[in-house]
Amino acid sequence: MLRFLNQCSQGRGAWLLMAFTALALELTALWFQHVMLLKPCVLCIYERCALFGVLGAALIGAIAPKTPLRYVAMVIWLYSAFRGVQLTYEHTMLQLYPSPFATCDFMARFPEWLPLDKWVPQVFVASGDCAERQWEFLGLEMPQWLLGIFIAYLIVAVLVVISQPFKAKKRDLFGR
């Protein structure tokens, strides 16, 4: 399995599949926001940023999957998936155990050199409350679904990183 994952990490297909899944999740979030009129909270915006990190890592990996650039993509992927797990866990705890003392910020805080909320306000401006439950599917809230998704991204990322020393076997079909 590790040899297979190493082989996949050196091809564009797996990276593009990951980019497609992250893009589909981002488009779904925008659909929830602009069509279903659900208000994203600050943690939702940060989770969206973590998902953009996974998308960016996938695109970097797809650019040159056989070069050391894929290691940069793996580091970004690991970091983004890990931060996504942290953020969605915090968001889930805020929704499951609401407290007047544990709340999220009113506005997303981006660095001065990257004011995403000013550059693309349709995507990065938060207007909702983190503890408010707005959407449920099969008994799980949106942060709980995202927690599972980010855990899956993180597990696969760890396995792909572990698989890097395992080179694919060369198949000699006609040799002895």
UniProtKB/Swiss-Prot annotation:
Annotated TM spans: 15-31, 50-65, 72-89, 145-163
Compartments where found: Cell inner membrane
Organism whose genome encodes this protein: Escherichia coli O1:K1 / APEC
GO molecular function: electron transfer activity; protein-disulfide reductase activity
Keywords noted in UniProt: Cell inner membrane, Cell membrane, Chaperone, Disulfide bond, Electron transport, Membrane, Oxidoreductase, Redox-active center, Transmembrane, Transmembrane helix, Transport
Domain of life of the native organism: Bacteria
Its biological purpose: Required for disulfide bond formation in some periplasmic proteins. Acts by oxidizing the DsbA protein.
Disulfide bonds: C41-C44, C104-C130
Name of protein: Disulfide bond formation protein B
Cytoplasmic side: 1-14, 66-71, 164-176
HAMAP family the UniProt entry points to: DsbB
Family per record: Belongs to the DsbB family.
Family annotation (Pfam families): DsbB
Ranges in the topological domain labelled Periplasmic: 32-49, 90-144
GO cellular component: plasma membrane
Topology within the bilayer: Multi-pass membrane protein
GO biological process, one term: protein folding
Gene that encodes it: dsbB
Source organism phylogeny: Bacteria, Pseudomonadati, Pseudomonadota, Gammaproteobacteria, Enterobacterales
